[in-house]
From Swiss-Prot:
It comes from Sulfolobus acidocaldarius (strain ATCC 33909 / DSM 639 / JCM 8929 / NBRC 15157 / NCIMB 11770). Gene3D superfamilies: 1.50.10.10. Changing residue 525 to E: 15% of wild-type activity. NCBIfam families: trehalase_H1_Arch. Catalyzes the hydrolysis of alpha,alpha-trehalose into two molecules of D-glucose. This is Trehalase 1. Its EC number is 3.2.1.28. Pathway: Glycan degradation; trehalose degradation; D-glucose from alpha,alpha-trehalose: step 1/1. GO terms for biological process: trehalose catabolic process. The gene is treH1. The lineage of its organism: Archaea, Thermoproteota, Thermoprotei, Sulfolobales, Sulfolobaceae.
Length: 558
């Protein structure tokens, strides 16, 4: 099984893959939340597509030519080789262009349904078909390599998914080869034109956010993977291949301020389309990429898990929770979009939905919920959730130029029930602090220099700060929180920026990036001892907050 090291990420708005030094170890077809066809990331026997030198001694490195176009380079005493991996725009496919001076071995072992089914293999003159034995779907590999060895000067491998094996590409002959070369070059041009910057960190973060957008609907998933553990060997393994309202709101904001107004608006449109008038405006905290209800959470018993971290889960039971902060995140993102673009038509088209959110929050703000961290224990009056309900009403006041009295009631309740010994606490029945309290000044609930917040900040620094990183909390319903959280650490950096401590903020951002190596892809948690990421990867809302922090550290407002 793989060690905890940075993996290359590529995506194309339909699905995504992770590449480990020439081996595709995670790939789902036909979309992000589909079962894997290459799943070595979660089990050695769950399928992979690997290319590596025949000889044993070589050096390997990975880098991005442009975002979502990954180069893997092998160097040995006998020469060098390069694999360029990308997912062509608009296709459920992957192209691997190989240029080499040395012999390379390649191995392709797809396994359908998370490693459960071995394919039926059909060899044809111009490639191989891999058929799912329990359905009509198949993978087709177009290749002019007749064996499992790639000889100099190299070749181009094209792997494409078909929902029905009757419509595979193996009968298109030479015409497809010309189209394939064109698709490869145009995909590179697409990302080069789409993301223009000399800042590699910024460029990679934008590439991750755009690569994780499901282009048919405009929705944005939280991460490319499922069940990468928060701590190796632990059971905190969740499926993040869904559209969280909270995460998507952050992503919309980050894309907006990075110049991607259309993509930001599409994310907002996707979420607004889910608002209903019958009950809670957003019934679920998360949705499938097409807007349907997320599937039930189940465990996959035949997979050993990442480094034997069981169970492997697909689906996410948090979908059934009540989370009261999400409407606040959405309305805040809508307000920022409106303020940035002056797009009054957008607001007017969604006026009834925005107003309903305000009405519902005004009537239901005293409910308990599972909180931002999706605690699976008893619901509580979480401070952060109450604050985000205040945010919802505050932003609606600004958008609609009205006064909502319940906003003041929420703030009074929070200050009366969620402040203890001069500090904000995690919930009304707790004396502990929580890293999400760092967001209170970020969302203008309280001034960053207010004595109550400064005491809260001091407690977070004393109680949750670990070797330059910030834990979310000390413990939850599953016990102790083992590793710091990348998102919380960036929040702390954003607070320091507001306090004028920019050098300290930059130190924190540099530390968050340190485990990413040269790829600048960031995970969810940081294993401080090994200086490696844990949890699902790459993590979209971390990259979103990083983009906001980088903008703020340069003195630009968000």
């Amino acid at each position: 099984m793989l060690g905890m090291k940075p993996l290359g990420f590529i995506g194309n708005g339909l699905t995504s893959a992770l590449v480990d030094n020439g081996s595709i170890v995670w790939l789902t077809f036909p979309r992000f939340d589909s079962p894997s066809v290459f799943g070595k990331l979660l089990d050695d026997n769950a399928g992979e597509f690997s290319i590596r030198p025949v000889e044993d001694k070589f050096k390997v490195s990975q880098s991005y030519l442009v975002p979502n176009v990954l180069s893997t380079t092998f160097k040995s005493s006998n020469g060098k080789a390069e694999i360029v991996d990308l997912m062509p725009i608009g296709e459920k496919a992957i192209i691997r262009k190989v240029r080499t001076e040395i012999p390379l071995s390649f191995k392709i072992i797809p396994m359908f349904n998370y490693g459960l089914y071995r394919p039926i293999i059909r060899r044809k003159d111009d490639g191989i078909q891999f058929l799912n034995p329990v359905s009509r779907e198949c993978l087709s590999l177009l290749s002019d390599v007749p064996t499992d060895e790639i000889k100099p000067p190299g070749t181009t491998l094209y792997l494409v998914y078909s929902s029905d094996c009757a419509y595979g590409p193996l009968d298109k002959g030479k015409q497809l080869e010309n189209d394939l070369e064109n698709s490869f070059n145009l995909t590179i041009d697409y990302w080069k034109d789409k993301i223009r910057s000399n800042d590699e960190v910024w460029r990679t973060s934008v590439g991750v956010l755009l690569g994780l957008i499901y282009s048919p609907s405009g929705s944005s998933i939280a991460a490319a993977t499922t069940s990468l553990p928060e701590a190796v060997g632990d059971s905190r393994n969740w499926d993040y291949r869904f559209v969280w309202v909270r995460d998507s709101s952050m992503i919309s904001e980050a894309l907006l301020y990075s110049g991607y107004v259309v993509e930001a608006r599409r994310i907002l449109n996707f979420m607004l389309a889910l608002v209903n008038f019958t009950a809670k405006p957003l019934l679920h905290p998360l949705y499938a990429v097409d807007g349907s209800d997320p599937p039930p959470e189940i465990e996959i018993p035949w997979l050993s898990g990442y480094m034997n971290s069981r169970p492997v889960r697909v689906g996410n039971a948090a979908a059934s929770q009540i989370q009261l902060d999400i409407e606040g995140f959405l309305v805040d993102a809508i307000y920022k979009y409106y303020k940035y673009t002056s797009d009054r038509v957008f607001v007017e088209e969604n006026w009834d939905k925005i107003k309903y959110i305000g009405d519902w929050v005004s009537k239901n703000w005293m409910l308990k919920d599972a909180g931002m961290w999706e605690d699976r224990g008893d619901p509580k009056h979480y401070t952060h959730s109450k604050v985000m309900m205040w945010v919802a009403l505050d932003r609606i006041e600004k958008i609609m130029n009205v006064k909502i009295h319940e906003k003041d009631e929420i703030k009074e309740w929070v200050m009366r029930n969620c402040v203890k010994d001069g500090s904000f606490v995690r919930s009304s029945d707790s004396n502990d602090v929580d890293a999400n309290l760092l967001t209170l000044p970020l969302y203008d609930f309280i001034d960053v220099k207010d004595p109550i917040f400064l005491k809260t900040l001091k407690r977070i620094e004393d109680e949750l700060y670990v070797d330059g990183f910030v834990k979310r909390y000390s413990q939850d319903f599953m016990g102790e929180a083992k590793h710091p959280f990348a998102l919380a650490t960036i929040w702390l950096a954003r607070v320091y920026i507001r306090l004028g401590r920019k050098e300290r903020a930059m130190e924190l951002l540099d530390k968050v990036l340190k485990p990413s190596g040269t790829l600048y892809l960031i995970g969810e948690h940081i294993d401080v001892e090994n200086m490696e990421y844990t949890g699902n990867y790459p993590q979209a809302f971390v990259h979103a907050q990083l983009l906001l922090a980088l903008k703020e550290v340069k003195g630009l407002s968000t």
